[in-house]
Amino acid sequence: MIYCRGSVETGPAYATATNKIVNLDFRRYSNFVDTDSAVGCLIIACSNGILGTYSHLSQEGITKFDEFLLQLNKEWSDSKPRYGLVGMSKTTILHEPSTSSIVAKMRRSGYTFSGEVVGGDSVQRKVVMWADRLVISESSPLTKVVEKEVNFL
């Protein structure tokens, strides 16, 4: 299972993958992310060209981010290009407006998604949605990380 995460700050965002470390300079993308409300926003990246985020994006920001994902998938792809979305929220990821918009675009392009946040601690919960699987990672300061992978394609 390829799973990675990196926190987004005003400087570089670091993401680790199974066999690759990706260094993203978040300042390059600050023109379409509302940095004032990006607390808790995550960017993920891995060696087969998957990258995603959820944050408070405007409609223009969603369009720019969609183009950004396409470009990075082209640049990083050493296998079949795929999208990835990661969310950090106390609510279901598909209920986030920006994420829902991106998912809707991807569904029109033939991608399939399923699942939602289940259980977990309200302090911190992460959901990674892939085109062919769903990984649910729940963690809190008091418990170990529990991961559940659901293949549905």
What kind of feature is each model-predicted range?
Residues 1-153:
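Active-site microenvironment for binding and transforming phosphate-containing groups
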